[in-house]
Design a protein with these regions (language model features):
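N-terminal Sec/ER secretory leader and immediately downstream segment
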Residues: 1-98
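Extended amphipathic alpha-helical interaction segments
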Residues: 101-187
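A cross-kingdom marker for long, charged
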Residues: 182-237
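Short, charged, amphipathic alpha-helical segments
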Residues: 72-76, 96-97, 136-139, 161-168, ...
Length: 237
């Protein structure tokens, strides 16, 4: 069904790829890259899908940093958002398992539950023939992941660390997906910022081989992705 609806291998793995990036960027200044989890449920499906992906990315950050106190809130918020999108039944068991495993500090198992949560949400959306929302879950995770990684690199810059921000395949993939989004959504403040800022991020991070992203460019990418994520969590239409 994934092939049939045009969802290729980047959709499901995209958020869990953040684990590789975070492990490469350790030690993680957790308090400086953490954010308050969303305390409300967006009313529109696009922001809901993006929010689910972002919270899964927050979960990966918390697992990588082994912050036990942060796991239970993530499990509860993830379930609330999934219910808002109409796929709560597919996440309930994973949310419960995440909370139970956090009490035992079973980090590897929590990671697996987060990965399964995205897969279940994606499968449910594809079952509803809602390919667009499945892509937005993946995009939401990637955007939050980019905010986290640019913040870590900004905190302790080296050219090698900054080189991890160059992801041309993912950039092209998500820009292609954004170009096909519902025209009504693309006219919203979030939709406009999403396309405009992603194109600017691509411009900044498109580099010749062995050319680093400079410190001021890291700062600019962080600003651009933060603007998008603030619109996702802040509710501005």
């Amino acid at each position: 069904i994934r092939e049939e609806l045009g969802v290729n291998s980047y959709t499901a793995p995209s958020i869990q790829l953040l684990f590789k990036e975070l492990n490469a960027l350790k030690p993680i200044p957790f308090e400086k890259v953490w954010r308050d989890l969303p305390d409300s449920t967006p009313q529109d499906r696009a922001r809901l899908a993006l929010s689910i992906g972002a919270v899964i990315a927050d979960g990966f950050l918390t697992v990588t940093a082994e912050k036990q106190s942060g796991i239970e809130p993530i499990g509860r918020v993830l379930l609330r958002l999934a219910k808002g999108l109409g796929v709560g039944d597919h996440v309930t068991k994973h949310s419960r398992s995440i909370i139970e495993k956090a009490a035992r500090k079973e980090w590897g198992d929590i990671r697996k539950e987060l990965i399964r949560s995205q897969a279940e949400v994606e499968a449910a959306l594809l079952g509803l023939k809602d390919e667009e929302m499945a892509h937005l879950v993946a995009l939401g995770g990637w955007l939050r992941g980019l905010e986290i990684t640019t913040s870590i690199v900004h905190e302790s810059y080296t050219p090698a660390r900054a080189s991890r921000l160059i992801q041309p395949e993912l950039m092209n993939y998500f820009l292609d997906r954004v170009s096909t989004l519902n025209p009504k959504f693309k006219k919203t403040k979030l939709g406009t910022a999403l396309e405009k800022n992603l194109r600017e991020i691509k411009r900044i991070t498109t580099k010749p081989v062995n050319t680093a992203v400079e410190p001021d460019e890291v700062t600019r990418v962080r600003e651009l992705v933060r603007e998008i994520n603030a619109l996702v969590s802040g509710g501005e239409e």
